[in-house]
Amino acid sequence: MKREERRLSLAAGLVASSLALTVPAFAEGEVVFSSWGGSFQDALRSAMLAPAASTLNITVKEDTTNGIQDVRAQITAGAVAWDVTEQDLPSCETLSREGSLEPIDYSIVDTTGIPKELIHENYIGFINFTKVIAYRKDTFGDNGPSNWAEFWDLENFPGKRGMHGKVNYNLEAALMADGVPMQEVYDTLATDEGIARAWDKLGKIAPEVTVWYRGGSQSAQLLRDGEVDVIHMGHNRVESVIASGIDVAYAFDGGTMDIDCLLVPKGSPNKENAMRLINELLGAEAQARLSVTMPLGPVNTGAFDTGIISDEMAVKVNTHPTNYDKQLLVDPNFYIGQLGELTEEFDTLIQQ
C-alpha cells in the first residue's frame, strides 16, 4: 500500500472509532489509545479510559489493533496514529528489539506495585489474561471438552472448533493435548524434537477447526452465535458471553495465561500524554476497577488491597490464588527471536 493510501486508511480507522471518545468539558490535548475492541475495550473505557481522561483533562481517542503487524505498518508508512497500544508480551519485546518503541518515561510512570519483571525500558506490563477452553452447554451438556486431549478428540466430543489464528498458545496447547505435563511444555519446546512434536499434533486438528479467529471480539461473537461449539478464547470474553444469557462452561485448568503490555510506538504524536495515560492505567484503583468490570488479572498487586474487588469477584480473576497454579504461564522467551518464523509456518499450516 502506498504511503498516502496508508495514511488515509489509518485516518479512516480513527474516524470509524470516533464514537469511542472520552472528552472532558475543557480538554487540553489528546491521546490515541488502541486495544482489542469489543466488550473488552468497552470495559477499559468505563473502568480506566474515562476516569483517566477526566483526571488528566485530555481527550482520549480509541482505535482497535489486531497485533504487532499494525504497529509495524504505521511505523513503516511514516504515519504513526497511535500514542499508546496494548500488545501481547512477545510482540512488545520483539518491537523493542526492532527499535520500534519510545522509551517509557519512568519520571512520569509510577511503578509502585508492579512486579520488577514486568518493568522494561520500552514497555510495561498491563494485565494478566487467560485463554481457556469454553463450550456451549446446548451442544455438550455438562460434559464438554475440559482439557486439551478432549479438545483434540472429535470422535468422543464432536462439534465445531474455534482456535486463535496466531501461533501463540497453539503449540503449547498441542503439546498438552499430546500428553506433555503443563510444567514441562517449555522444556519440550526448547528442543527441535519438541517443536516438531507440537507441529505434528497441531497439524492433526488444523483441518477440523471451523474458524481461526483473529480478534477477541470475534471469538465472543462466534461462541455467542453458535458458529462454534467449543473454543480456546479469553476467559474475560467467555464471561461476557455468559452475561449475555448464553449457557457456556469453562475452567482455568490447562488455560494459557499471558500478559499484555503497554507501549508507545516510535513517532507517537502525543508522547507526553501517552506517558501520563499509561501512569493512570497502571494505578491500583484503575486496575481494580477493570477486574470488577471484567475478571482480568491486575498487574498492580495493590489492586487487591483497594477494597474494590469483592471476595465473590476475586475467585473469577485468573491471578487469584485458587486459580493461578492451574494455568500455564506463557513464556515469551520461546517466541522472541523466532516469532516471525513460527508465524510463517503456522500461517502455512492453517491455510492448507
Q: Where are the model-predicted features located?
A:
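Extracytoplasmic ligand-binding site segments that recognize negatively charged/polar headgroups
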Residues: 38-43, 81-82, 86-220
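Early extracytoplasmic/lumenal segment of secretory-pathway proteins
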Residues: 28-94, 220
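Conserved C-terminal helix/tail region of periplasmic/extracytoplasmic solute-binding proteins
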Residues: 322-352
